């Protein structure tokens, strides 16, 4: 268990719990190009910013439980729970050009999600997201089971064919207070597809 104010684990730094759980409590965490890994549960409580650009937060056999003021997982950052679930409660979640994956996902990001060129996937179950605007331009959003999104706008468009975002799931249920922009984007469900939005642009 680690605690403190500002925690830095940059540039190939490694914090690893080989036999069990890892718990971190800090005012902020800078994990750029660093790794925080646990064999069991990996639990982080960060009061302010969690910067994981190019870094890795891992649970090998447990769950990944994250709370932070904001989370930047861009520039090749990885959030991974190989065999368990991942829960995230944060303000702005930036997953641009990052990878977030687990058997199931539950994300609450009060200030929005940025997933441009990113990959956000529930490999074995549901992917449930509650947020403000979700920007998936050029990104991938997936679930083996249900993909549920409650939010404001969903931006999935591209400038030309093949450049929009990709959404795929066993079932899709979107409830949006704002617009769904899907020009040159792709939304594909294996079974049910429910879209509720103030406006839908599906041209292209």
Task: Give residue ranges: language-model regions.
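Surface-exposed loop/turn motifs in large extracellular/passenger domains
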Residues: 1-6, 18-27, 38-48, 59-70, ...
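Short, T/G/N/S-enriched strand-turn elements that build extracellular solenoid repeat scaffolds
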Residues: 10-16, 31-37, 52-58, 73-80, ...
